[in-house]
Amino acid sequence: PAKLPDEQDLRAVLAYNMRLFRVNKGWSQEELARQCGLDRTYVSAVERKRWNIALSNIEKMAAALGVAAYQLLLPPQERLKLMTNSADTRQMPSESGI
């Protein structure tokens, strides 16, 4: 996915993240649907922001993709901030000097 979604549009964030994690696994929409026990047209509609999605289906998709459910709803901009902060923390010595 090229264009980052609006952080306030959770359906866009979910669609972006689903596609990102799915493509990173090398999966088609059909394969993700099979892994989740859902229909391919449902996965396609969610990725196109056509349908709202039940939390139980977010959990199924997250489990199939090997991520925590919250990661599907985390704006990519926030994920980058967390990764940057985590890297900064690892590089800085602790306050105790250890």
Residue spans for each PLM region:
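A short, Lys/Arg-rich alpha-helix, primarily the initiator
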Residues: 1-24
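Short basic helix-loop element that most often maps to the first helix and adjoining turn
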Residues: 16-35, 60, 87-88
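Conserved hydrophobic/aromatic packing and binding residues within compact polymer-binding modules
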Residues: 18, 32-33, 43-46, 72
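Recognition helix of helix-turn-helix/homeodomain-like DNA-binding domains
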Residues: 37-53
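DNA major-groove recognition helix of helix-turn-helix
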Residues: 47, 57, 76
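DNA major-groove recognition helix of helix-turn-helix/homeodomain DNA-binding modules
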Residues: 56-71
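Short, charged recognition helix plus adjacent turn
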Residues: 74-98
